[in-house]
Structure formats: C-alpha cells, structure tokens
C-alpha cells in the first residue's frame, strides 16, 4: 500500500497520515527526516546531501529520489509507505515515475483557502507547554490566556495570516498541478485517485479513508 497525500497546508494531511500509519502499520516518509537521518548516518547519499546543504543550496530531485528509493527497501516498508510533502512539483513526480517508484493511492484533501486561513490563523499557543487552542474551535476559558497557568497565549509566526496566504499561493503554483497529473495517471490505470472533503470532522474523513483503503 503505497500512498501519496496531497492538499494545501492546514488541509488535515498530518492528522490523517497519523491515522493511516496507526491503522495500517505503514511508515510515513518525510523527506526532511530522511535527509537528516542520511546525514547523521554518514552514508554516501548523506555526505552528498550535507555538502549541498552546507553550501546553502537546495537538495536536487535526483538526490531526494535516491533517498526515497533507499528508504523503501528497508524492512518497515515491506507493506507499503506514506509520502506526505513529496512530491511537491511535477518534475519531482516525473522523477519518481522514472525511478520506478509505484504509487497505489493518491489521496487529495480538499479544503477551501478561506477555511484553511480560518483554521490556522485562529490558533493560539502556550509556548512553555505546547498547548494549542483555537479562538473558534477550541477557545481557552479566558480569552488569550492559558487554561492551566493563566499565562498569555501567543501566535506562532507560521500561523500569521500573511505567512499562511503566502504558503497557499506557493501551494497553488507548485503543488496543485499534481492534482491533474495524478488524475491522468489514474485514468491511465497507473494509480487510484480519490478526492476527500477535508471540511468534515476528522473522524468522518478517517472513516472514508478506511473504506477506500480497506
């Protein structure tokens, strides 16, 4: 069961990735984690990655694909894997295909931009404990105060509206074209493509995933 999750930041991919990992016992492959692990292990690919990153450059598609290929040969990937946050662009998807990395399911989480902005911008955090609130969906008992300590809540830089809107623009420019790319792949019989309504409750989305994945 080889799965790719698509969707804008804040669409709920991370939450559902956790559900899939726990239910089906397959690992999530995050390219950032793979890069760090390879650098730490001092493997040939890791040394190459370190050299590029130390120079302040972006790691090439080829190197990331090589890391993915190496990672999927490991024991915990026997029953499949979950890719979340990769591929991000059509050249990366093409490179995966050329490398012979097959994908069984592509799952798109569809949430309108304004709802994503609402979800993320409303977050408030108690920095010391990591407790997260939401002004609309999970408000603190006292406005802008932590329930336990009474200390001030803050807004993370990543949760500020300008940052969220910038990330959404990047998503629509770079990653959204993958939707039509993988739909064509599904039409050609190379994968199965499902679009899920990410505006629903977490449990409802998880239930639909369980039906799709069996």
Curated annotation (Swiss-Prot):
One of its GO terms (molecular function) is adenylate kinase activity. Pfam families: ADK, ADK_lid. It is found in: Cytoplasm. Its main location: cytoplasm. GO terms for cellular component: cytoplasm. Residues 30-59 are annotated as: NMP. Coiled coil: none annotated. Pathway: Purine metabolism; AMP biosynthesis via salvage pathway; AMP from ADP: step 1/1. CDD domains: ADK (cd01428). One of its GO terms (biological process) is AMP salvage. Its EC number is 2.7.4.3. It catalyses: AMP + ATP = 2 ADP. ATP binds at residues 10-15, 123, 132-133, 200. InterPro entries: Adenyl_kin_sub (IPR006259), Adenylat/UMP-CMP_kin (IPR000850), Adenylate_kinase_lid-dom (IPR007862), P-loop_NTPase (IPR027417). Keywords: ATP-binding, Cytoplasm, Kinase, Nucleotide biosynthesis, Nucleotide-binding, Transferase. The keyword Cell division does not apply. It is an enzyme of class 2 (transferase). AMP binds at residues 31, 36, 57-59, 85-88, 92, 156, 167. Residues 122-159 are annotated as: LID. Belongs to the adenylate kinase family. Monomer. Catalyzes the reversible transfer of the terminal phosphate group between ATP and AMP. Plays an important role in cellular energy homeostasis and in adenine nucleotide metabolism. This is Adenylate kinase. The lineage of its organism: Bacteria, Pseudomonadati, Pseudomonadota, Gammaproteobacteria, Enterobacterales. The gene is adk.
